[in-house]
C-alpha cells in the first residue's frame, strides 16, 4: 500500500509527446535530478488514485523534459496519464539546503508580518523569473509575496508560521 502522506509532488505530466508513450513533464523545481536516480515513482492521477511506475530515462528538451514509463509504449496509454502528478517519497529526495524548503512543506503556513499583522494562509506557490511567488489569502484579501531574502524573515515549519518583512507598498496592492 502506498502511504500518500509521505509523498512529495515533484512535477506534472502535461501532454503526450509522439506516438510511443512519451510524456511532457513540467518539473516544479526546474530540475529532474531526483527522477533520474530513482527506480520507481508514484503517479497521482487527477482523481487522486496512486499508482507506482518505473520511469525510463528523462530526456531534456528546450523548455521541457520528456519522460516515459515501462509498460507505457503507446500514445493511448500515455494519454491516460496526462494531468497526473509525479510524486516521490521524501527519502528519495535530497535534504533541502539551509533556508530552502519543499513547496509542499510551505503550503498551509500562517503568514504574518514581523510587526504581528496576520495576512492569511500560504495557499499557492508559483515560479516567476528568478524567484518563487507565495500566494497568501486571508480576510478577503490576496497577497503575492516574493520569496526573496529581503522579504522572508523566518519560516518555522514546526509552528506552522512564516514571518515576512514587506517591501514598501507590497501589502497595498
From Swiss-Prot:
GO terms for cellular component: cytoplasm; ribosome. It holds the Pfam family PRC_RimM. Keywords: Chaperone, Cytoplasm, Ribosome biogenesis, rRNA processing. GO terms for molecular function: ribosome binding. The keyword Chaperone applies. Gene3D superfamilies: PRC-barrel domain, RimM. The keyword rRNA processing applies. Residues 98-170 form the PRC barrel domain. GO terms for biological process: ribosomal small subunit biogenesis; rRNA processing. It is found in: Cytoplasm. Belongs to the RimM family. HAMAP family: Ribosome_mat_RimM. Binds ribosomal protein uS19. An accessory protein needed during the final step in the assembly of 30S ribosomal subunit, possibly for assembly of the head region. Essential for efficient processing of 16S rRNA. May be needed both before and after RbfA during the maturation of 16S rRNA. It has affinity for free ribosomal 30S subunits but not for 70S ribosomes. PANTHER family: RIBOSOME MATURATION FACTOR RIMM. The PRC barrel domain binds ribosomal protein uS19. This is Ribosome maturation factor RimM.
Amino acid at each position: 500500500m502506498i502511504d500518500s502522506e509521505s509523498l512529495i509532488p515533484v512535477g506534472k505530466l502535461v501532454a503526450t509527446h509522439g506516438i510511443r508513450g512519451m510524456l511532457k513533464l513540467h518539473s516544479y523545481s526546474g530540475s529532474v535530478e531526483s527522477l533520474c536516480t530513482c527506480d520507481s515513482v508514484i503517479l497521482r492521477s487527477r482523481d487522486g488514485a496512486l499508482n507506482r511506475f518505473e520511469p525510463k530515462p528523462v530526456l531534456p528538451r528546450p523548455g521541457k523534459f520528456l519522460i516515459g514509463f515501462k509498460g507505457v509504449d503507446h500514445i493511448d496509454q500515455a494519454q491516460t496519464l496526462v494531468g497526473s502528478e509525479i510524486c516521490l517519497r521524501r527519502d528519495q529526495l535530497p535534504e533541502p539546503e539551509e533556508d530552502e524548503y519543499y513547496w509542499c512543506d510551505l503550503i498551509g503556513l500562517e503568514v504574518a508580518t514581523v510587526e504581528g499583522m496576520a495576512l492569511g494562509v500560504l495557499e499557492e506557490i508559483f515560479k516567476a523569473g528568478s524567484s518563487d511567488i507565495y500566494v497568501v489569502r486571508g480576510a478577503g484579501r490576496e497577497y503575492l509575496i516574493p520569496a526573496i531574502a529581503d522579504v522572508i524573515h523566518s519560516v518555522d515549519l514546526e509552528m506552522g508560521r512564516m514571518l515576512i518583512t514587506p517591501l514598501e507598498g507590497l501589502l497595498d496592492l
